[in-house]
């Protein structure tokens, strides 16, 4: 029987560092539409939705032909929005796709799904990229991951980890804004209170780890450019121009 795998892109208008970010035009196309189009290329997704509390975003998504689900504005996180959107749905795997990665590789989405398909004991998955640029490694806007021998994440941090005692650049990984969930665990996680490390690093995935849930990572050599501030739009446009 074919699995129902739903990719959901949580999206809100009022980003603190970049208000209106989902509707920012990137080479003539709203960013949220670019994210949807990339997600729709993933072979392992059955459906792609956008979960938002903003009618402007919903209208833009629906105009592009994709599905938008309205969620309450009181929800504080993307995880909460996804859990709400899927609360009455029967799905096998859920993928949380960040709305600020307009060149997200479809292969990365498929990799997150594949981790959960291979091992039914794993409740949550993600994707990391080998990190070789020291400036990115030092950048607090770039989230780093340290992995165990089986690919399970030991920690996520904005700090440059692991720390090489003898100096130089260590074997490091950059975390992509992408998660796969078992639907039951997603609903549980959304109901948990924020945890100390989550609040310290401002990284929601640490809530799962602090509650004893293993997050398994797939390592993929793919491109990933997150749009955090307006200047990042130019980086994405330069990448798209170079790729043509």
State the predicted function of each range.
Residues 52-53, 104, 181, 228:
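A conserved hydrophobic position in a structured secondary element of the catalytic/binding core
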Residues 49, 55-114:
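Short phosphate-binding loop-to-helix
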Residues 7, 48-50, 94, 125, ...:
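Hydrophobic/aromatic residues located in beta-strands of well-ordered beta-sheets
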Residues 104-195:
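Conserved core of the sugar-phosphate nucleotidyltransferase
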Residues 170-244:
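Conserved alpha/beta core of the MobA/IspD/sugar-nucleotide pyrophosphorylase nucleotidyltransferase superfamily
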Residues 45, 91, 119-122, 213:
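Short, high-confidence coil segments that cap the C-terminus of an alpha-helix
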Residues 3-51:
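N-terminal glycine-rich phosphate-binding loop and ensuing alpha1 helix
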């Amino acid at each position: 029987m074919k699995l129902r795998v739903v990719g959901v892109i949580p999206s809100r208008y009022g980003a603190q560092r970049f208000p209106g970010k989902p509707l920012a035009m990137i080479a003539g196309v709203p960013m949220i539409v670019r994210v949807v189009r990339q997600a729709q290329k993933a072979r392992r997704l059955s459906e792609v939705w956008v979960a938002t509390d903003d009618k402007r975003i919903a209208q833009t998504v629906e105009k592009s032909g994709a599905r938008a689900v309205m969620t309450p504005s009181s929800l504080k996180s993307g995880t909460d929005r996804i859990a709400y959107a899927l609360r009455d749905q029967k799905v096998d795997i859920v993928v949380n796709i960040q709305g600020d990665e307009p060149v997200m590789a479809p292969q990365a989405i498929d990799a997150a799904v594949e981790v959960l398909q291979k091992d039914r004991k794993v409740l949550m998955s993600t994707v990391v990229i080998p990190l070789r640029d020291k400036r990115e490694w030092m950048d607090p806007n770039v989230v780093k991951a340290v992995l165990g021998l089986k690919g399970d994440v030991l920690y996520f941090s904005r700090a440059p980890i692991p720390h090489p005692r003898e100096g130089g650049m260590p074997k490091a990984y950059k975390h992509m804004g992408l998660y796969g969930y078992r639907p039951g665990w997603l609903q549980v996680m959304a109901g948990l209170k924020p945890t100390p490390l989550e609040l310290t690093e401002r990284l929601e995935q640490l809530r799962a780890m602090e509650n004893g849930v293993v997050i398994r990572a797939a390592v993929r050599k793919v491109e990933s450019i997150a749009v955090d501030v307006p200047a990042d739009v130019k980086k994405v446009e330069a990448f798209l121009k170079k790729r043509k």
